[in-house]
Amino acid sequence: MKALWALLLVPLLTGCLAEGELEVTDQLPGQSDQPWEQALNRFWDYLRWVQTLSDQVQEELQSSQVTQELTVLMEDTMTEVKAYKKELEEQLGPVAEETRARLAKEVQAAQARLGADMEDLRNRLGQYRNEVNTMLGQSTEELRSRLSTHLRKMRKRLMRDADDLQKRLAVYKAGAQEGAERGVSAIRERLGPLVEQGRQRTANLGAGAAQPLRDRAQALSDRIRGRLEEVGNQARDRLEEVREQMEEVRSKMEEQTQQIRLQAEIFQARIKGWFEPLVEDMQRQWANLMEKIQASVATNSIASTTVPLENQ
């Protein structure tokens, strides 16, 4: 039984470990007609419309219309996910209790991450509405630019976690179909060759050493798998935080540069206003002085010419 579930889980775990290297696409792979996927598609369509930041979007963002619509779509999606998970639990065949609990825990964690992503998106749009309403007619271009950047990042995170949830539900569904269609006898028949191979290996290795070795290998594999998932999630979260911090620093630097430029222009205008009257006054005084000097020189020249004439 464990070997069967190990075969089912290997592709899922491989995909999870590769998430950090693959670019998140715009659509979920392998979509079906499940109600929860249809509800999620409606959420995607609405989010794509919000990301256009058209005039209508801007108008509705300034009210509570967008957040109300998102709330309804979020609740519909999570309700359908819970219903589908419950349906699979009821169909799940006679698998080991440990396997059942582990799968349920993984699906629950993926479901919680997707719900948290949706909640973060709604809160960010509410924050944007508050910021726009406080601008009171001022330019909101910078706010729209930052919102557009945040929406792209949030959409990537949503797609990543939605894809993860879909993969884990697929594994859950595989177990349910196996139990519903074939039952215990079919599973035993399928596992017969594996059991026989295990017995042969046990005979070769020794009855006392084979089972503890397999148990230790299984435990080590579980620990490594869990640790790799934990490290991968932490690394992705940290990278996202660093990117957001760098974006905020860049925005602040641009804002400060603009402020410094404006202050320099204002100071230059003030300096010009201070010195222009002084320069004009000095020019007038200099012109008056030159006129007086020229008049004095002319008077002296006339006087010098008149005196010799009188002496004659």
Swiss-Prot record:
Alphabetized Gene3D superfamilies for the sequence: Apolipoprotein (1.20.120.20)
Q: Where is this region: Homooligomerization?
A: 258-312
Residues bearing Phosphoserine are S139
Q: Which family does it belong to?
A: Belongs to the apolipoprotein A1/A4/E family.
Protein keywords: Chylomicron, Endosome, Extracellular matrix, Glycoprotein, HDL, Heparin-binding, Lipid transport, Lipid-binding, Oxidation, Phosphoprotein, Repeat, Secreted, Signal, Transport, VLDL
Signal peptide extent: 1-18
Q: Name one GO cellular component term.
A: extracellular exosome
Q: How does it assemble?
A: Homotetramer. May interact with ABCA1; functionally associated with ABCA1 in the biogenesis of HDLs. May interact with APP/A4 amyloid-beta peptide; the interaction is extremely stable in vitro but its physiological significance is unclear. May interact with MAPT. May interact with MAP2. In the cerebrospinal fluid, interacts with secreted SORL1. Interacts with PMEL; this allows the loading of PMEL luminal fragment on ILVs to induce fibril nucleation.
Q: To which species is this protein native?
A: Rattus norvegicus
Where are residues bearing Methionine sulfoxide located in the sequence?
A: M135
Q: What is this protein called?
A: Apolipoprotein E
Residues forming coiled coils: none
Where does each sequence repeat begin and end? 72-93, 94-115, 116-137, 138-159, 160-181, 182-203, 204-225, 226-247
Disulphide bridges, residue numbers? none
Region LDL receptor binding: which residues?
150-160
Q: According to the UniProt record, where is the region LDL and other lipoprotein receptors binding?
A: 150-160
Cellular localisation? Secreted; Secreted, Extracellular space; Secreted, Extracellular space, Extracellular matrix; Extracellular vesicle
